[in-house]
């Protein structure tokens, strides 16, 4: 029977970051992930990292190993309406407003550091049951079919004083889970532009929904938010037709070239009211799933990770005790709910083509451009969160 102090469910970027933050804590840590190691490291999704996230990754000792693309300027505008603004890193005396990296590359750098620390990672091992008890959580670990460990004769029990769930979707229908279906899908792809990205990102609000372009390597990572019906139409047209549609949305500001294969996924808001329970804490997508309009998901998750690690380091003793987890939850309330509702408000205002809202949107963008303190507030929230370090 394994008896770690901390069982981390999920060896993606969030779970690996937590293990790395606690590597010198004296806690016995084990990670388990149902996926093969290669699948985690090959994840092609792109993540927008805020400047505050860079500071955390530097403290974890992995920043210099990451192949990141900096975002030095963010241009925000709307199609067919007035109002625009541009956020510039030099205005805040920062090297960049944010950075873009593939999820697989980030997981690879974090995993290499975790492996160097000697913390065990159980790949292709699914946690099929969690049973909280007075002094521990009993977890059932099962090797996934076809994995090297699948010949083990019995399911392996594990008794952990604390379980951190850092993978998987939230339980639909749970009384503690708030859900909102935005009736939107995101199309994601890579797209080339003449002249390269020059470390610029674009957020363009259109009648069909917002479009984000993030500089990544030598081209842009594209995220287009549309209705499910419109997503069907855009997936059915050929590459040339799709590029023509994008050109129409952006006008002459950018000249688009080739586009990669498009993928889609549904969008919604889902979060736990309480990120901590009986000897269990939920992180990342297991705690909240946000709309990508503000790029806050992973950045919020990493702030949660850092706060949890800090709480465990300050409260020595039982890591799964109620007082410890209450202290963690209290410390994250302002930033966590601020990010959730900030993102939800952006979706409601900027993903709606109702005429009065379109005018409000234009006025808001104009205000951001003309009122530096307001622009600074938005920029600093995106870079650092509500309670992150400056």
Language-model features: locations:
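Conserved FAD-binding catalytic core of PHBH/FMO-like flavoproteins
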Residues: 144-149, 153-157, 162-255, 259-262
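N-terminal Rossmann-like FAD-binding beta1-loop-alpha1 element of flavoenzymes
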Residues: 4-31
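C-terminal helical "tail/cap" subdomain of flavin- and related membrane-associated enzymes
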Residues: 310-390
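FAD/FMN-dependent oxidoreductases across multiple families
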Residues: 233-320
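N-terminal FAD cofactor-binding segment of flavoenzymes
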Residues: 43-79
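Conserved N-terminal helical subregion
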Residues: 2, 68-175, 180-188, 194, ...
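Glycine-rich FAD pyrophosphate-binding loop
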Residues: 23-45
């Amino acid at each position: 029977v394994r008896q770690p102090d901390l069982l981390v469910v999920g060896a993606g970027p969030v779970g690996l970051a937590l293990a790395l933050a606690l590597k010198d804590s004296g806690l016995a840590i084990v990670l388990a992930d149902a996926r093969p190691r290669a699948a985690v490291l090959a994840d092609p999704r792109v993540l927008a990292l805020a400047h505050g996230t860079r500071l955390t990754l530097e403290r974890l000792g992995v920043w210099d190993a990451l192949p990141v693309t900096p975002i030095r300027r963010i241009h925000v505008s709307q199609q067919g309406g007035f109002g625009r603004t541009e956020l510039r890193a030099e205005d805040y005396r920062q090297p960049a407003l944010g950075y873009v990296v593939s999820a697989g590359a980030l997981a690879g750098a974090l995993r290499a550091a975790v492996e160097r620390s000697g913390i065990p990672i159980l790949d292709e091992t699914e946690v099929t049951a969690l049973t909280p008890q007075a002094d521990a959580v009993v977890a059932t670990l099962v090797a996934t079919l076809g994995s090297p460990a699948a010949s083990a004769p019995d399911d392996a029990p594990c008794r952990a004083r604390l379980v951190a769930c850092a993978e998987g979707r939230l339980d639909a229908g749970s009384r503690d889970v708030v859900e909102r279906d935005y009736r939107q899908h995101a199309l994601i792809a890579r797209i080339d532009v003449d002249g390269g990205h020059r470390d610029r990102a674009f957020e363009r609000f259109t009648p069909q929904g917002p479009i984000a372009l993030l500089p990544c390597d030598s081209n842009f990572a594209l995220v287009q938010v549309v209705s499910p019906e419109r997503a069907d139409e855009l997936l059915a047209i050929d590459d040339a037709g799709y590029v023509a549609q994008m050109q129409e949305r952006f006008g002459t500001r950018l000249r688009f070239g080739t586009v990669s294969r498009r993928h889609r996924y549904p969008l919604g808001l889902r979060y736990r009211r309480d990120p901590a329970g009986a000897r269990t804490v939920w992180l990342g997508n297991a705690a909240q799933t946000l709309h990508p309009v503000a790029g806050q998901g992973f950045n919020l998750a990493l702030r949660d990770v850092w706060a949890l690690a800090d709480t465990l380091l300050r409260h020595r003793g039982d890591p799964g005790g109620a007082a410890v987890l209450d202290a963690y939850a209290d410390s994250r309330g302002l930033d966590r709910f601020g990010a959730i509702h900030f993102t939800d408000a952006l979706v409601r205002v900027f993903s709606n083509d109702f005429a009065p809202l379109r005018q409000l949107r234009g006025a808001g963008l104009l205000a951001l451009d003309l009122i530096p303190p307001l622009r600074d507030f938005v920029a600093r929230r995106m870079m650092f969160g509500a309670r992150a370090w400056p």
